[in-house]
Amino acid sequence: AADTLGALLIHVSTDYVFNGTATKPYTESESLAPLGAYGASKLEGEKSAAKARRHLIVRTAWVFSEYGNNFLKTMLRVGAERDELKVVADQIGTPTYAGDLAAALLLMAEKSVPTGIYHFSGGLPCSWWEFAEAIFRCAQQEGIVSVPPKLTPITTDEYPTPAKRPQYSVLDNSKLQSALGTHTADWSLAIPLVLKKLGLQQA
């Protein structure tokens, strides 16, 4: 359909297409080996999108925002209910603010970057436990949380999930940065923005 209209197809994919055994950030040319059905379905989506003459496949990871269900909102919700939270500390990735991703997608279309696969994620890598620490630290500074819960680091084996996550899924953003001539936004700077927007929604 996109080819019939002469349109650009933008497909958002995920870090789940990798198996997580790397020791350095994944580039777009790394071999793909999804760990489960979810990752395999995302890889099939990439293959379908790549059939379009003009396509951009953008892999991202650990997306959070003031909307929908995501890690930041879950932490705030369960943190208000419990004195202690156990958070996985041996999975490493790069949180990505949905607003930054949306802005990057618009810029990619405006600048007519070459067809292909790109990575976009939110800057410095961290564990889920470190991400949670940053969320509650900021929430306390913003006056949203008076006493944050105790955060206890645990292993992946102690917290199984239906869709198996890659242990290490840090994405190398350099190809897209070069194409756009910009640097990736820092996910930690987006946390206070999201908290403020959540406060306005609840007001």
Provide a role label for each language-model segment.
Residues 4, 8, 17-58, 62-63:
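Catalytic helix-loop patch of NAD(P)-dependent Rossmann-fold dehydrogenases
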Residues 36, 93-96, 126, 171, ...:
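Residue-level signal for the nucleotide or nucleotide-sugar donor/cofactor binding architecture
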Residues 50-100, 106-107:
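NAD(P)-dependent short-chain dehydrogenase/reductase
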Residues 66-67, 91-100, 120-138, 193:
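Substrate-binding strand-loop-helix patch
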Residues 111-162:
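Mid/C-terminal beta-alpha module of Rossmann-like enzyme folds, strongest
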Residues 157-179, 184:
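A hydrophobic C-terminal alpha-helical subdomain
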Residues 187-203:
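Amphipathic terminal alpha-helices
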